[in-house]
A protein has these predicted regions:
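N-terminal accessory/interface modules of nucleic-acid-binding and processing proteins
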Residues: 1-269
Length: 269
């Protein structure tokens, strides 16, 4: 199978990585670059509260071996563990590169690999090509979100980012302001603003009895669209890529230097 180029992997990732968390998206970029054939929109399924809490990603081989047994066109899933929660998330990548020539893993083998990873039998998952599932190790129960389409994920991640930007602001209605910003982001990037429309926002503003708070909410929403990183998500994303490239280059140079020093030390013995 033809591997995607670096630029193609970057392009298909698009703004969705950026919206996950403004401070650190390196784990997501790293996943995209290590497994570019799976790096399309569904990498954003790794929508966690804090990307820095990701402690482990499975290897590509393990990734391929872990799948779901329910669908006839079974696709791989990926597992990630988090420090602060006793939860093992399972992300369905069934909507990833539909044109890829790579065959899906054997369903029975994939199912047993998943059971081995979890350490016990999960309850039956609901059938859905838009599935995002996770297994709660405390409750020992599978949970499935069937409404994980692209637009819903974009709106959800955008709302998380905007909420973080507004959490220290006073004199505004944070919920209304968030809705306004998410609506504008959706319109800007061609995402369906389903559930957030102009009439609903107008009604919400009318329900604010304090006119100063209503006015401040509108001004803050407009201001949010002018500040980093919402001002230009694509430019922000490219900046993160350059930073990642620089870090990787420095790491490679450091490893090469250490290897050379070790070689010289061994030759002197």
């Amino acid at each position: 199978m033809a591997m995607l180029s670096y630029d193609e992997a970057i392009h298909i990732a698009n703004v969705q990585y950026t919206l996950v968390k403004s401070q650190n998206i390196v784990p997501f970029l790293d996943m995209a670059l290590r497994f570019p054939e799976y790096a399309k929109e569904n990498i954003c399924l790794l929508m966690v509260q804090d990307p820095e809490e990701v402690t482990e990603f499975r290897t590509q081989r393990e990734w391929l071996e872990c799948g779901t047994h329910l669908l006839p066109d079974v696709r791989p899933i990926t597992l990630a563990l988090f420090k602060s929660q006793s939860i093992l998330y399972v992300f369905d990548v069934s909507q990833t590169d539909q044109q890829r020539s790579l065959l899906p893993p054997n369903a029975e083998k994939a199912y047993h690999a998943l059971i081995q990873t979890l350490g016990q039998e999960p309850v039956e998952l609901e059938e859905s090509k838009n599935r995002v599932a996770y297994y709660d190790l405390t409750e020992k129960q599978w949970y499935v979100n069937l409404k994980s389409n692209h637009s819903a994920r974009f709106r959800s991640i955008a709302a998380i980012l905007v909420s973080k930007l507004l959490e220290k602001e006073t004199g505004i209605d944070a919920i209304v302001t968030t809705d306004m910003v998410v609506y504008m982001l959706c319109k800007k990037y061609g995402i369906s603003p389903e559930g957030i429309n102009l009439k609903a926002m107008q009604d919400s503003l009318r329900r604010i009895t304090d006119t100063a708070i209503a006015d401040n909410s509108i001004r803050m929403a407009m201001h949010c669209m002018t500040i980093h990183p919402l001002r230009d998500l694509d430019a922000y994303y490219q900046g993160q890529i350059k930073q990642l490239e620089m870090e990787r280059k420095q790491q490679a140079e450091q490893e090469a230097l250490q290897a050379e020093q070790q070689k010289q030390a061994e030759e002197k013995r």
